[in-house]
Protein backbone atom coordinates (compact mmCIF):
# COMPACT_ATOMS: atom_id res chain seq x y z
CA UNK A 1 0.00 0.00 0.00
CA UNK A 2 1.11 3.53 -0.66
CA UNK A 3 -0.31 7.02 -0.49
CA UNK A 4 -0.69 8.63 -3.90
CA UNK A 5 -2.76 11.37 -5.55
CA UNK A 6 -6.17 10.26 -6.75
CA UNK A 7 -7.33 11.34 -10.16
CA UNK A 8 -10.99 12.28 -10.33
CA UNK A 9 -12.85 9.99 -12.71
CA UNK A 10 -16.35 11.29 -13.46
CA UNK A 11 -17.33 8.10 -15.27
CA UNK A 12 -16.34 5.96 -12.30
CA UNK A 13 -18.19 8.23 -9.85
CA UNK A 14 -21.28 8.04 -12.05
CA UNK A 15 -21.07 4.26 -12.14
CA UNK A 16 -20.72 4.09 -8.35
CA UNK A 17 -23.72 6.37 -7.83
CA UNK A 18 -25.78 4.38 -10.30
CA UNK A 19 -24.89 1.05 -8.70
CA UNK A 20 -25.72 2.44 -5.26
CA UNK A 21 -29.11 3.90 -6.20
CA UNK A 22 -31.14 0.73 -5.50
CA UNK A 23 -29.62 0.41 -2.02
CA UNK A 24 -30.48 4.05 -1.25
CA UNK A 25 -34.06 3.48 -2.36
CA UNK A 26 -34.24 0.34 -0.22
CA UNK A 27 -33.06 2.24 2.85
CA UNK A 28 -35.72 4.91 2.27
CA UNK A 29 -38.53 2.35 2.30
CA UNK A 30 -38.77 2.17 6.09
CA UNK A 31 -39.01 5.93 6.81
CA UNK A 32 -41.59 6.34 4.02
CA UNK A 33 -43.65 3.52 5.52
CA UNK A 34 -43.42 4.96 9.03
CA UNK A 35 -44.43 8.43 7.81
CA UNK A 36 -47.46 7.13 5.89
CA UNK A 37 -48.55 4.94 8.80
CA UNK A 38 -48.25 7.75 11.34
CA UNK A 39 -50.28 10.16 9.21
CA UNK A 40 -52.96 7.52 8.70
CA UNK A 41 -53.07 6.48 12.35
CA UNK A 42 -53.46 10.09 13.49
CA UNK A 43 -56.46 10.41 11.18
CA UNK A 44 -58.26 7.18 12.06
CA UNK A 45 -57.12 6.10 15.52
CA UNK A 46 -55.53 9.10 17.18
CA UNK A 47 -52.63 9.55 19.55
CA UNK A 48 -52.93 6.06 21.05
CA UNK A 49 -52.48 4.55 17.60
CA UNK A 50 -49.35 6.61 17.00
CA UNK A 51 -47.98 5.63 20.42
CA UNK A 52 -48.64 1.98 19.64
CA UNK A 53 -46.96 2.27 16.26
CA UNK A 54 -43.90 3.87 17.82
CA UNK A 55 -43.36 0.61 19.69
CA UNK A 56 -43.99 -1.42 16.56
CA UNK A 57 -41.55 0.89 14.79
CA UNK A 58 -38.76 -0.23 17.14
CA UNK A 59 -39.59 -3.83 16.30
CA UNK A 60 -39.60 -3.00 12.58
CA UNK A 61 -36.17 -1.39 12.84
CA UNK A 62 -34.78 -4.48 14.57
CA UNK A 63 -36.35 -6.88 12.07
CA UNK A 64 -35.21 -4.88 9.06
CA UNK A 65 -31.68 -4.76 10.46
CA UNK A 66 -31.69 -8.57 10.32
CA UNK A 67 -32.95 -8.55 6.73
CA UNK A 68 -30.35 -6.00 5.67
CA UNK A 69 -27.62 -7.99 7.40
CA UNK A 70 -28.55 -11.12 5.49
CA UNK A 71 -28.82 -9.28 2.16
CA UNK A 72 -25.50 -7.51 2.63
CA UNK A 73 -23.87 -10.78 3.61
CA UNK A 74 -25.17 -12.36 0.40
CA UNK A 75 -23.89 -9.56 -1.85
CA UNK A 76 -20.27 -10.79 -2.12
CA UNK A 77 -21.54 -14.32 -2.78
CA UNK A 78 -23.79 -13.06 -5.57
CA UNK A 79 -20.99 -10.87 -6.92
CA UNK A 80 -18.40 -13.64 -6.87
CA UNK A 81 -20.72 -16.07 -8.65
CA UNK A 82 -21.62 -13.41 -11.19
CA UNK A 83 -17.95 -12.62 -11.80
CA UNK A 84 -17.26 -16.32 -12.30
CA UNK A 85 -20.27 -16.47 -14.65
CA UNK A 86 -21.59 -19.35 -12.58
CA UNK A 87 -25.37 -19.31 -12.97
CA UNK A 88 -25.82 -22.46 -10.89
CA UNK A 89 -24.11 -20.91 -7.85
CA UNK A 90 -26.04 -17.67 -8.33
CA UNK A 91 -29.36 -19.47 -8.10
CA UNK A 92 -28.13 -21.60 -5.21
CA UNK A 93 -27.18 -18.55 -3.16
CA UNK A 94 -30.45 -16.83 -4.08
CA UNK A 95 -32.45 -19.80 -2.82
CA UNK A 96 -30.33 -19.96 0.33
CA UNK A 97 -30.78 -16.23 0.95
CA UNK A 98 -34.54 -16.44 0.51
CA UNK A 99 -34.78 -19.43 2.86
CA UNK A 100 -32.63 -17.81 5.55
CA UNK A 101 -34.48 -14.50 5.29
CA UNK A 102 -37.92 -16.09 5.31
CA UNK A 103 -36.99 -18.37 8.20
CA UNK A 104 -35.53 -15.49 10.20
CA UNK A 105 -38.56 -13.30 9.59
CA UNK A 106 -40.88 -16.14 10.62
CA UNK A 107 -38.96 -16.52 13.90
CA UNK A 108 -39.16 -12.77 14.52
CA UNK A 109 -42.88 -12.81 13.75
CA UNK A 110 -43.48 -15.66 16.18
CA UNK A 111 -41.45 -14.00 18.93
CA UNK A 112 -43.16 -10.63 18.70
CA UNK A 113 -46.57 -12.30 18.85
CA UNK A 114 -45.57 -14.36 21.88
CA UNK A 115 -43.78 -11.50 23.65
CA UNK A 116 -45.89 -8.55 22.51
CA UNK A 117 -46.92 -7.51 26.02
CA UNK A 118 -43.38 -7.85 27.35
CA UNK A 119 -41.99 -5.74 24.51
CA UNK A 120 -44.55 -3.01 25.18
CA UNK A 121 -43.62 -3.00 28.87
CA UNK A 122 -39.93 -2.65 27.97
CA UNK A 123 -40.73 0.60 26.18
CA UNK A 124 -42.96 1.91 28.97
CA UNK A 125 -46.19 1.85 26.99
CA UNK A 126 -49.35 2.85 28.81
CA UNK A 127 -52.43 0.61 28.93
CA UNK A 128 -54.20 1.94 25.79
CA UNK A 129 -51.02 1.82 23.69
CA UNK A 130 -50.22 -1.69 24.96
CA UNK A 131 -53.70 -2.96 24.09
CA UNK A 132 -53.50 -1.53 20.57
CA UNK A 133 -49.94 -2.79 20.04
CA UNK A 134 -50.65 -6.34 21.19
CA UNK A 135 -53.68 -6.50 18.90
CA UNK A 136 -51.87 -4.89 15.97
CA UNK A 137 -48.62 -6.88 16.02
CA UNK A 138 -50.08 -10.08 14.47
CA UNK A 139 -51.88 -8.03 11.80
CA UNK A 140 -48.86 -5.92 10.93
CA UNK A 141 -45.95 -8.29 11.57
CA UNK A 142 -46.68 -10.75 8.77
CA UNK A 143 -45.32 -8.09 6.42
CA UNK A 144 -41.86 -9.18 7.63
CA UNK A 145 -42.22 -12.47 5.74
CA UNK A 146 -42.41 -10.77 2.36
CA UNK A 147 -40.24 -7.76 3.23
CA UNK A 148 -37.34 -10.11 3.93
CA UNK A 149 -37.64 -11.77 0.53
CA UNK A 150 -38.04 -8.43 -1.25
CA UNK A 151 -34.80 -7.27 0.34
CA UNK A 152 -32.95 -10.37 -0.86
CA UNK A 153 -34.33 -10.11 -4.40
CA UNK A 154 -33.30 -6.45 -4.60
CA UNK A 155 -29.82 -7.33 -3.36
CA UNK A 156 -29.59 -10.16 -5.89
CA UNK A 157 -30.54 -7.88 -8.77
CA UNK A 158 -28.14 -5.03 -8.05
CA UNK A 159 -25.32 -7.43 -7.15
CA UNK A 160 -25.63 -8.88 -10.65
CA UNK A 161 -25.60 -5.50 -12.45
CA UNK A 162 -29.35 -5.29 -12.94
CA UNK A 163 -29.54 -1.81 -11.50
CA UNK A 164 -32.69 -0.75 -13.31
CA UNK A 165 -34.57 -3.86 -12.25
CA UNK A 166 -33.48 -3.50 -8.62
CA UNK A 167 -34.39 0.20 -8.59
CA UNK A 168 -37.79 -0.65 -10.08
CA UNK A 169 -38.45 -3.17 -7.31
CA UNK A 170 -37.59 -0.66 -4.58
CA UNK A 171 -39.53 2.20 -6.17
CA UNK A 172 -42.63 0.03 -6.54
CA UNK A 173 -42.26 -1.29 -3.02
CA UNK A 174 -41.40 1.85 -1.07
CA UNK A 175 -42.89 4.70 -3.04
CA UNK A 176 -45.93 3.30 -4.84
CA UNK A 177 -47.45 0.15 -3.35
CA UNK A 178 -46.87 0.92 0.33
CA UNK A 179 -48.31 4.48 0.34
CA UNK A 180 -51.19 3.44 -1.94
CA UNK A 181 -52.11 0.39 0.14
CA UNK A 182 -51.97 2.34 3.39
CA UNK A 183 -54.17 5.14 2.04
CA UNK A 184 -56.64 3.03 0.07
CA UNK A 185 -57.09 0.15 2.51
CA UNK A 186 -57.51 2.58 5.39
CA UNK A 187 -60.03 4.68 3.45
CA UNK A 188 -62.10 1.68 2.39
CA UNK A 189 -62.15 0.19 5.91
CA UNK A 190 -62.35 3.53 7.77
CA UNK A 191 -59.05 2.66 9.42
CA UNK A 192 -60.09 -0.79 10.65
CA UNK A 193 -57.70 -2.63 8.32
CA UNK A 194 -54.81 -0.17 8.44
CA UNK A 195 -52.54 -2.69 10.15
CA UNK A 196 -52.84 -5.11 7.22
CA UNK A 197 -51.87 -2.51 4.61
CA UNK A 198 -48.08 -2.87 4.74
CA UNK A 199 -48.32 -6.64 4.51
CA UNK A 200 -50.52 -6.38 1.42
CA UNK A 201 -48.03 -3.92 -0.13
CA UNK A 202 -45.10 -6.23 0.60
CA UNK A 203 -46.95 -9.20 -0.90
CA UNK A 204 -47.74 -7.27 -4.11
CA UNK A 205 -44.14 -6.04 -4.22
CA UNK A 206 -42.86 -9.60 -3.85
CA UNK A 207 -44.98 -10.80 -6.76
CA UNK A 208 -43.69 -7.93 -8.90
CA UNK A 209 -40.10 -8.59 -7.79
CA UNK A 210 -40.41 -12.24 -8.79
CA UNK A 211 -41.85 -11.25 -12.17
CA UNK A 212 -39.08 -8.69 -12.78
CA UNK A 213 -36.37 -11.17 -11.75
CA UNK A 214 -37.67 -13.98 -13.94
CA UNK A 215 -38.21 -11.68 -16.88
CA UNK A 216 -34.64 -10.39 -16.59
CA UNK A 217 -33.40 -13.99 -16.68
CA UNK A 218 -35.48 -15.11 -19.61
CA UNK A 219 -33.07 -17.25 -21.58
CA UNK A 220 -30.62 -17.34 -18.66
CA UNK A 221 -28.57 -14.84 -16.68
CA UNK A 222 -26.84 -12.33 -18.93
CA UNK A 223 -23.28 -11.76 -17.78
CA UNK A 224 -21.59 -8.41 -18.41
CA UNK A 225 -17.84 -7.91 -18.63
CA UNK A 226 -17.75 -4.20 -17.62
Model-identified regions with their sequence ranges:
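Alpha-helical transmembrane segments of multipass membrane proteins
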Residues: 35-40, 62, 152-156, 179-184, ...
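Hydrophobic faces of transmembrane alpha-helices in multi-pass small-molecule transporters and flippases
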Residues: 5-36, 41, 62, 66, ...
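Short alpha-helical transmembrane segments in multi-pass integral membrane proteins
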Residues: 1-21, 78-143, 184-226
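Hydrophobic alpha-helical transmembrane segments in multi-pass membrane proteins
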Residues: 23-35, 39, 68, 100-113, ...
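Helix-terminus/linker motif at the lipid-water interface of multi-pass membrane proteins
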Residues: 31-58, 62, 80-81, 118-127, ...
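Alpha-helical transmembrane segments of multi-pass membrane proteins
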Residues: 61-63, 127-153, 179
Amino acid sequence: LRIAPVKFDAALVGKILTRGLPEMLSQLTTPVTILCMNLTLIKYIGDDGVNAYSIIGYIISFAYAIFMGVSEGMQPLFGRSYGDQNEEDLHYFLRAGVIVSFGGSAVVYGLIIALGGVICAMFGADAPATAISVAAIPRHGWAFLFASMNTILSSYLYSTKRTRESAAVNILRGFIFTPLCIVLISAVSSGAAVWYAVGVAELISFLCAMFITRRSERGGVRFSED
